[in-house]
Curated annotation (Swiss-Prot):
This is Trigger factor. It comes from Escherichia coli O1:K1 / APEC. Consists of 3 domains; the N-terminus binds the ribosome, the middle domain has PPIase activity, while the C-terminus has intrinsic chaperone activity on its own. Homodimer and monomer. In vivo most of the ribosomes are in complex with monomeric TF. Uncomplexed TF, however, is in a monomer-dimer equilibrium with approximately two thirds of TF existing in a dimeric state. GO terms for molecular function: peptidyl-prolyl cis-trans isomerase activity; protein folding chaperone; ribosome binding.
Length: 429
């Protein structure tokens, strides 16, 4: 076997391989012998068909199969010998084959980039220092009560957290526009659903009033014909409602899994959940800064084959989220995913190099801790932990999560990490 390697462009490589004619003939004869042992031909017992008849009937197809197998095996031998690491599936380009002559073909593919990590000491990371306070717990209890609130009609003016039922008609330069009209539209105030100024124009009015408000569409508004335009909305305020928050009764508290129904038990459960969410948020904030710094400090070439593969993954994930099928997923334009796919590939390559250079392996104690932390959010943590322990795929996924965390910590060990005190709400919102 003769092998030559050339660079085509960037990460592109072409390996040209020549297989000696006698190697081909030896492999063909060997395969014909195997075929002769299995085939049945009228007039001959199984395994007793003369080789010339076997060759006459099956020679062409056997030769084609043998060439395909030799191309694959010789390519693998070549890249091992040349210490080449292909990224993605190779493309085989066969040359012209002539019986009794050497056979030359080429294989085109991309290789993984050579990554030499740099700039880790210049990465700056700000780690939030946060404590869950009693006031934070109070705020979360209020949120839980609001989520379970009922609505009661009121006679007074609209306030910031009320709910209104309105008819409205919008116009620009005196002309109504598409999508600018609705009847019996229910709007919960304070959630930012409408364009700036719309809710402010309703506040202070009472049910039964009809009025007009002036607003301006944002420059980034999705409808081209409305961007930056001044508009008027004729409003008919039909109903105003205010929240009625439930009391912290034992019955209400038990809905959240606090069996004794006590306020103290609910506060403890809420605090535990908030601290778990806080721990995760801090970890993610620090991780995102470390990865962002790593990416900025290391500009690497990315194999197109890896980006294509990642785009396929993102397409299928998008289709699953929206209830689509695989065919629909493949029809989604690649431009929707290309930037994210490239980013994910770059991050994967860089973290992979961090793992390699630091000789990291998944810490099983960390894996156990991650599973326990995740399971604590469920009603029966022991059942979740047992389910994970019996599922190899889930365990491998969690090991990958742990290994990624260890890689990020290796980056942080060299980065400039400063601490900044902040509040729970500032971090989470």
């Amino acid at each position: 076997m003769q092998v030559s390697v050339e660079t085509t462009q960037g990460l592109g490589r072409r390996v040209t391989i020549t297989i000696a004619a006698d190697s081909i003939e030896t492999a063909v004869k060997s395969e014909l012998v195997n075929v002769a042992k299995k085939v049945r031909i009228d007039g001959f017992r199984k395994g007793k068909v003369p080789m010339n008849i076997v060759a006459q009937r099956y020679g062409a197809s056997v030769r084609q199969d043998v060439l395909g197998d030799l191309m694959s095996r010789n390519f693998i031998d070549a890249i091992i010998k040349e210490k080449i690491n292909p990224a993605g599936a190779p493309t085989y380009v066969p040359g012209e084959y002539k019986l009794g002559e050497d056979f030359t073909y080429s294989v085109e593919f991309e290789v993984y980039p050579e990554v030499e990590l740099q700039g880790l000491e210049a990465i700056e990371v700000e780690k939030p220092i946060v404590e869950v306070t009693d006031a934070d717990v109070d705020g979360m209890l209020d949120t839980l009560r609001k989520q379970q609130a009922t609505w009661k009609e009121k006679d007074g003016a609209v306030e910031a957290e009320d709910r209104v039922t309105i008819d409205f008609t919008g116009s620009v330069d005196g002309e109504e526009f598409e999508g600018g009209k609705a009847s019996d539209f229910v709007l919960a105030m304070g959630q930012g659903r409408m364009i700036p100024g719309f809710e402010d124009g309703i506040k202070g009015h009472k049910a039964g009033e009809e009025f007009t408000i002036d607003v301006t569409f944002p420059e980034e508004y999705h409808a081209e014909n409305l961007k930056g335009k001044a508009a008027k909305f004729a409003i008919n305020l039909k109903k105003v409602e205010e929240r009625e928050l439930p009391e912290l009764t034992a019955e209400f508290i038990k809905r959240f899994g606090v069996e004794d129904g006590s306020v103290e038990g609910l506060r403890a459960e809420v605090r535990k959940n908030m601290e778990r969410e806080l721990k995760s948020a801090i970890r993610n904030r620090v991780k995102s800064q470390a990865i962002e710094g790593l990416v900025k400090a290391n500009d690497i070439d990315v194999p197109a084959a890896l980006i294509d593969s990642e785009i396929d993954v993102l397409r299928r994930q998008a289709a699953q989220r929206f209830g689509g099928n695989e065919k629909q997923a493949l029809e989604l334009p690649r431009e929707l995913f290309e930037e994210q796919a490239k980013r994910r590939v770059v991050v994967g390559l860089l973290l992979g190099e961090v793992i390699r250079t630091n000789e990291l392996k998944a810490d099983e104690e960390r894996v156990k801790g991650l599973i326990e932390e995740m399971a604590s959010a469920y009603e029966d943590p022991k059942e979740v932990i047992e389910f994970y322990s019996k599922n190899k795929e889930l365990m491998d996924n969690m090991r990958n999560v742990a290994l990624e965390e260890q890689a990020v910590e290796a980056v942080l060990a060299k980065a400039k990490v400063t601490e900044k005190e902040t509040t729970f709400n500032e971090l989470m919102n």
